[in-house]
Amino acid sequence: MIRIASLLLGAALLCAQGAFARRVVSGQKVCFADVKHPCYKMAYFHELSSRVSFQEARLACESEGGVLLSLENEAEQKLIESMLQNLTKPGTGISDGDFWIGLLRSGDGQTSGACPDLYQWSDGSSSQFRNWYTDEPSCGSEKCVVMYHQPTANPGLGGPYLYQWNDDRCNMKHNYICKYEPEIHPTEPAEKPYLTNQPEETHENVVVTEAGIIPNLIYVIIPTIPLLLLILVALGTCCFQMLHKSKGRSKTSPNQSTLWISKSTRKESGMEV
């Protein structure tokens, strides 16, 4: 019984640890509780031979109901950066490797003035947000766009080659990032969250749930109190009976206690043999 309880407690701790220590995993779709946020997937390939071209990345995302990443604003750019940072934490084995995003150039604009204006999002987004690296886009034969991810490379004129954008030839092989519509799952109504800006609420109204091991142990211990009392009563009864028997054995007959046998020879006076 004790072993089963230990296993259950260990499983609960592992689940809690998994909930608070979640990290981005390559190839895993990441969604958020807020249904307004899209879902994303970082497709990273450790082997260079497994990386794909722009068109292959685009088709891979579309085959799963998504699109190659479009970025609407700086906030979304920062979100992707934080996800890539979690993806490349020490010990994951993930290092350098740029990521295709869904920006590409239409037309054959060769002049530096017209070239940046010819880039459009492949999913039809009208976002004008750009995060080009210094002196990019270089145009020419480079029409598709990657997000730099080269943490071990020496910094260039624009700083580290991290998260800024660079145009590249569309047949080059890179990783890619997919973007999906928010996933909506039917759930039971959750408890109403408290609002910190309501002055009429007291601190007692803020606490709506209990968490941790101690509150859970209380719910386990309370039902066992009657059983513990029963065990204590049984032990007390057994001890009383054993003590009563031991006292009975220690008492002996008064006649037996006065009997003894002398080992010395008694000499009778006045008797001759």
Curated annotation (Swiss-Prot):
Q: Which GO terms describe its cellular component?
A: centrosome; cytosol; membrane; perinuclear region of cytoplasm
Example of a GO MF term: carbohydrate binding
Keyword set includes Iron-sulfur:
no
| Residue stretches spanning the membrane | 217-237
- Give the region (Disordered) as residue ranges: 247-273
Q: Which SMART domains match?
A: CLECT
Give residue ranges for domain C-type lectin: 35-179
> In its UniProt record, which GO terms are filed under biological process?
nervous system development; regulation of neuron projection development
Ranges annotated as biased composition (Polar residues): 251-263
Among InterPro entries, the record links this protein to: C-type_lectin-like, C-type_lectin-like/link_sf, C-type_lectin_domain, CTDL_fold
The UniProt keyword set, sorted, is: Disulfide bond, Glycoprotein, Lectin, Membrane, Neurogenesis, Signal, Transmembrane, Transmembrane helix
Q: Which residues lie on this side of the membrane: Extracellular?
A: 22-216
Q: Cite the record's tissue specificity text.
A: In adult mice preferentially expressed in skeletal muscle, testis, brain, and lung. Expressed in striated muscle (at protein level). Expressed in spinal cord. Detected in spinal cord fast motor neurons (at protein level).
Q: What does this protein do?
A: May play a role in the development of the nervous system such as in neurite outgrowth and elongation. May be involved in motor axon growth and guidance.
What else is noted? Isoform 1 but not isoform 2 expression is down-regulated at postnatal day (P) 7 in spinal muscular atrophy (SMA) model motor neurons before onset of disease.
Q: How does it assemble?
A: Interacts with RABGGTB.
This chain belongs to the protein called Chondrolectin
The protein's organism comes out as: Mus musculus (Mouse)
Question: Corresponding gene?
Answer: Chodl
